[in-house]
C-alpha cells in the first residue's frame, strides 16, 4: 500500500519576542482538512514555528509522504541542513555552543523521521492561501487565552 500524500502548512507568531506566542498547522489530505493551533506564554517566534511543525506532524497516524510548507527559514534550514551537523557535534553549533531550542529540534527530528517530507519554504504574507490562514490561526491563538 502506498503512503498517503499530505500537505501541511505551519506558522508561528509572537506578541513580543519573547512574549505570548501562538502556533498553527493546517493539515490537508484529499478533501479532508484539520486545523490545529495553540498558545504559550513567554516564548519566542522560533519556538512557535518549531512547535507548529511538530504538532502538525504528530496529528498523522501513519507514515506519509508530506509536502510541508513553512515561512520560517530557521525551520527549513535547521531540519534540512544544520541538524545532521548538530547531531554529529553532540548538539553543538560550529561555535561550540549548545543548539538553541535543542529539545524542540530533537522532538522534530524524531517525529519527522517517521515520514518522507519535502520541506518547502513559502514567503510570508505573499498571498499563499494556506500560509495566510495558518498565520491568522497562530495570531488568533495568541489572543484567545
Curated annotation (Swiss-Prot):
Q: What does the Swiss-Prot or TrEMBL cofactor note state?
A: Binds 1 Mg(2+) ion per subunit. May bind a second metal ion at a regulatory site, or after substrate binding.
Keywords on this record?
Answer: Cytoplasm, Endonuclease, Hydrolase, Magnesium, Metal-binding, Nuclease
**Domain RNase H type-1: start-end pairs:** 2-143
Entry superkingdom: Bacteria
- Give the residues the record marks as binding Mg(2+) 1: 11, 49, 71
Q: What processes in GO biological process is this protein linked to?
A: DNA replication, removal of RNA primer
- Annotated PANTHER family: RIBONUCLEASE H1
| Protein name listed in UniProt | Ribonuclease H
Q: Which organism is it from?
A: Wolbachia sp. subsp. Drosophila simulans (strain wRi)
Amino acid at each position: 500500500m502506498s503512503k498517503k500524500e499530505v500537505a501541511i502548512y505551519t506558522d508561528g507568531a509572537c506578541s513580543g519576542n519573547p512574549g505570548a506566542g501562538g502556533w498553527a498547522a493546517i493539515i490537508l489530505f484529499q478533501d479532508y482538512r484539520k486545523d490545529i493551533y495553540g498558545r504559550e506564554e513567554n516564548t519566542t517566534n522560533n519556538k512557535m514555528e518549531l512547535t507548529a511543525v511538530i504538532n502538525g506532524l504528530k496529528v498523522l497516524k501513519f507514515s506519509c509522504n508530506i509536502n510541508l510548507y513553512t515561512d520560517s527559514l530557521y525551520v527549513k534550514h535547521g531540519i534540512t541542513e544544520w541538524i545532521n551537523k548538530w547531531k554529529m557535534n553532540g548538539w553543538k553549533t560550529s561555535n561550540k555552543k549548545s543548539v538553541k531550542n535543542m529539545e524542540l529540534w530533537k522532538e522534530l527530528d524524531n517525529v519527522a523521521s517517521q515520514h518522507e517530507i519535502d520541506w518547502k519554504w513559502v514567503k510570508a504574507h505573499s498571498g499563499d492561501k494556506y500560509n495566510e490562514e495558518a498565520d491568522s490561526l497562530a495570531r488568533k491563538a495568541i489572543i484567545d487565552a
